Amino acid sequence: MMSIKNWTRVGLAGAVMAAAIIAVPALAQSDRGVEARLAALEKRVALEEDRAQIENLTRAYGYYIDKKVWSEVVPLFSKDAVVEISGRGVYKGAKGVDTLFSKVIGRQHKGLADGELSNHMVLQGVTNVAPDGKTATGRWRAFIQIGMWQKMGLWAEGTYDIRYVKEDGKWKFSLMRWYGTYFTPYDKGWAQASFGNNGPSKEFPPDAPQSVQYDAYPGHYVPPYPYPNPVTGRPWTQADTDRYSTRGMDPSNAANSSSAGSPLSLESQHPQQPPR
């Protein structure tokens, strides 16, 4: 006959086995939960790494533009990129990007001339990477100082609206638009004088006309925000842009400015002046 002590041992063993059987599904479920959390964390880390690469790309672009290093600017754009800078019209593809920067903006010159200043401070970036990690949006602003020693100086500022794409594992610009906010001579400042946007180049015409006509200062234009309000989630609409933008106040209208016209008009006085 089995003793009470032995019965107790058998009972404990059975209880342990039963507990183990019950615990197996729970442990499996727990493992799946951990794996899911790890996968979500890995995705968040990957998106933050993408964001860092995008921000470095955009800042590097600004530094290359400063010194007119066009050979380093062009590779930053995707093969099907679309670029539009300051009312010059739309340039498409690698050839168009090279034409706009090296021939239109750079006027077929590489690097800065002696005594030339060309600062483009790319600031205040707001970037959002798509959940799939393949595309992203960005909104930045450029504060610009242009000058030729003892000849002229120019202030300018404007908004970059940018789309990015991951091409062959590298983030690049797929769409870039820069909307000029103001252009003004250094000696007078924005309180007394303002110039309108540049027009299209006759020598190196764009692939398509300017996508949107808008007012520079003393008028104002609000490019559509590519992101929703970070608190309310409300998306920006074209109706919002229309509501907050002026019409007919561009400095190209002589009635709006004592220094009406394009900032390129300064080039006739100072041929070496670098256009923006």
Tell what function each PLM region has.
Residues 29-52, 170-276:
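Terminal "cap-and-tail" regions of soluble proteins that handle hydrophobic small molecules
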Residues 19-26:
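C-terminal segment of classical bacterial N-terminal signal peptides
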Residues 144-154, 182-183:
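Short, cysteine-centered beta-strand-loop-beta hairpins and adjacent loop/turn segments enriched
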Residues 70-142:
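A solvent-exposed, acidic/Ser-Thr-rich amphipathic alpha-helical stretch
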Residues 2-15:
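Bacterial N-terminal signal peptides that target proteins for export
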Residues 50-66:
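Short, aromatic-enriched amphipathic alpha-helices that serve as compact interaction elements
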Residues 142-146, 164-166, 180:
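Beta-strand elements of well-folded, non-transmembrane domains
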